[in-house]
Curated annotation (Swiss-Prot):
Subunit structure: Monomer.
Biological process annotations from GO: arginyl-tRNA aminoacylation
Tagged with keyword ATP-binding: yes
Organism: Nitrosococcus oceani (strain ATCC 19707 / BCRC 17464 / JCM 30415 / NCIMB 11848 / C-107)
Catalytic activity: tRNA(Arg) + L-arginine + ATP = L-arginyl-tRNA(Arg) + AMP + diphosphate
Transmembrane segments annotated in the record for this chain: none
Family statement: Belongs to the class-I aminoacyl-tRNA synthetase family.
InterPro entries found in the cross-reference section: aa-tRNA-synth_I_CS (IPR001412), Arg-tRNA-ligase (IPR001278), Arg-tRNA-synth_N (IPR005148), Arg-tRNA-synth_N_sf (IPR036695), ArgRS_core (IPR035684), DALR_anticod-bd (IPR008909), Rossmann-like_a/b/a_fold (IPR014729), tRNAsynth_Ia_anticodon-bd (IPR009080)
Protein name: Arginine--tRNA ligase
One Pfam family from the record: DALR_1
């Protein structure tokens, strides 16, 4: 619909240009939007206000000139000029009825467009450290990122999905040490577990598999391991204790044996993450290893570029980045006193490699706890001369899980958390994914487990899926009633769809393509979730007020065409959110 109105306005502007009233006009300036108030028509354009200065006309006068030159169209019932020069369009009912035919003809393709055609997007999301299973907090980032990828693809962008595997650095060493200590316990040793180690049952499971598969690992006593270490918390510094313990175990095991423990821990957890995401309906084009940055020399190259440009300085044996020169609150260490790069150095190299691959846009989806990290990343890239317009860092608030009225506390380090796998087993993938995207990513959300499991109209995903299943049920009744749906005849008699509930449903269907485009461009999958709830509500109201399988063939076929189109749009929308559309419930 918007495209038809856009073309009408373009024709009018071309006429004004030919008459010399407009010297030129840019097609990108033509904007047509749905009105929020139906008393102002169905669509409105502010084009006369945009071009008034260029045309040397008052906006209202230019609006008069544009309206006078609009070609006639059977879908346009009335055109008004309102306020300072808005051009309001009221559409005739056939304009909305025509949407039914479009849906039935285009099927799965309905709602897709070419807005992003020829443009590429690099989308990195989830990227949880492989130090434990994915928990429900990661689930929201997964649902949001995957839905955004699907939406961007639907509007024409070529999307590259990537998971950045943080498989280097201190956290991975803490995991490896935690596994090794549990391994020693299985071998009969008794020793204190570090207060800041990883304590979940999954660590014990990795240790068990390590013991079952590796008989040649060296064995060291608790006395040998603990000798010479500083005190742990509460009497000592837990971080200094951990660092000393890591180095001690590396020395005792040697490079090869330590690497076996490290790889066993990494590969076990990473395999679980891959499996959980696949079951959640999330796939990636690439899993990018942080260690690969070191192997390819990317970190060293990035650091040398910063040094050469004068953006690094030495202090206390470490190399620091002048982040404050680029808007950050303080300078940041990139190379530690021991010569090892920091996580920040790896992230600089990773982002630089992404930017240099030529994508039109780089989107990072991070947990909200990383908000303080944004200024330093942007500062480093600005120092390297990168175009920050390419980079879009989006934050996702973690979901707060409730069981009844009780808030569930979670901590990966202590092992007290609900995994994404457990959540899906309890409420199902569909409920989890829909609930996760029902709020804007930047908004806090409370995840009600009991509501997500309920089969009632209060459960949003059930309500939407039930609308789809209900429509499927109507079509199954055709055979029982000895009716046959004549789709072609239904489309020929769409003019019979003039009841109030039908007009409401037609109007809602006509919005779908615009909602998909807006949800993609604004990075707002929740707009589509809201739309599907509204569409389901309109259908359920229609279902309760009217009989579809009436004896009049033309009316029956037209109504069946309408609900068939509704079914298709619900399925299309749910698919973009990664949710199934069941045919029976």
């Amino acid at each position: 619909m918007k495209e038809h109105l856009w073309n009408l306005i373009a024709d009018a502007l071309s006429s004004l240009q030919q008459e010399g009233i407009l010297s030129s006009w840019n097609k990108d300036k033509i904007q047509v939007q749905r009105t929020r108030d139906k008393s102002h028509g169905d669509f409105a354009s502010n084009i006369s206000m945009v071009l008034a200065k260029e045309a040397r006309q008052k906006p209202q006068k230019l609006a008069d000139l544009i309206v006078a030159r609009l070609p006639e169209h059977p879908w346009v019932k009335k055109v008004d000029i309102a306020g300072p020069g808005f051009i309001n369009f009221t559409l005739a009912l056939p304009a909305f009825q025509a949407v039914v035919s479009q849906v039935l003809e285009q099927k799965e393709s309905f709602g897709r467009c070419r807005t992003g055609h020829g443009k590429t997007v690099h989308l990195e999301f989830v990227s949880a450290n492989p130090t434990g299973p994915l928990h429900v907090g990661h689930g929201r980032g997964a649902a949001y990122g995957d839905a955004l990828a699907r939406l961007l693809t639907a509007v024409g962008y070529q999307v590259h999905r990537e998971y950045y595997v943080n498989d280097a650095g201190r956290q991975m060493d803490i995991l490896a040490v935690s596994v090794w200590l549990r391994y020693l316990e299985l071998c009969g040793e008794t020793l204190p577990f570090p207060s800041n180690g990883y304590q979940g049952e999954y660590v014990r499971n990795i240790a068990r598999s390590l013991k079952a598969g590796e008989e040649d690992l060296p064995h060291h006593s608790a006395t040998e391991i603990l000798a010479g270490l500083p005190a742990d918390a509460p009497t000592g510094d837990r971080e200094k204790y951990l660092d000393a313990l890591i180095q001690k175990i590396k020395n005792l095991l040697g490079k090869n044996s330590y690497q076996k423990v490290f790889e066993q821990a990494l590969n076990t957890i990473l395999a679980g993450i891959r499996e959980d995401l696949a079951k959640f309906g999330v796939t990636y084009d690439a899993w990018f290893s942080e260690r690969h940055l070191t192997e390819m020399g990317a970190i060293e190259i990035a650091i040398e570029r910063l040094k050469a440009a004068g953006h690094l300085y030495q202090k206390a044996g470490a190399w620091w980045f002048y982040a404050t020169n680029f808007g950050d609150e303080k300078d940041r260490v990139v190379i530690r006193e021991n010569g090892q790069p920091t996580y920040f150095a790896s992230d600089i190299a990773y982002h630089l490699s992404k930017l240099e691959q030529g994508y039109h846009k780089i989107i990072d989806i991070w947990g909200a706890d990383h908000h303080g990290y944004i200024p330093r990343i942007k500062a480093s890239l600005q120092a390297l001369g990168a175009d920050l317009q390419q980079l879009d860092i989006q934050l996702v608030q973690f979901a707060i899980l409730y069981r009844g009225k009780e808030k569930i506390q979670m901590s990966t380090r202590s092992g007290e958390f609900v995994t994404l796998r457990e959540l899906c087993q309890e409420v199902g993938k569909d409920a989890a994914r829909f609930f996760y995207v029902m709020r804007g990513a930047e908004q806090h959300m409370d995840f009600d487990l009991e509501l997500a499991k309920s089969q009632s109209n209060e459960n949003p995903v059930y309500y939407v899926q039930y609308a789809h299943a209900r429509i499927c049920s109507v079509f199954r009744q055709l055979k029982t009633r000895e009716f046959v749906w004549n789709s072609e005849q239904g489309r020929e008699h769409l003019g019979k769809l003039n009841e109030a509930h039908e007009v409401t449903l037609l109007d809602r269907l006509s919005c779908y393509s615009e909602v998909v485009e807006s949800a993609a461009i604004q990075s707002a999958p929740h707009l589509l979730a809201y739309y599907l709830l509204d569409l389901a509500r309109d259908f359920h109201t229609y279902y309760n007020a009217h009989t579809f399988l009436v004896d009049i063939p033309e009316l029956r076929d037209a109504r069946l065409a309408l609900i068939a189109a509704t079914r298709q749009v619900i399925k299309n929308g749910l698919t973009l959110l990664g949710v199934s559309a069941p045919e029976s419930m």
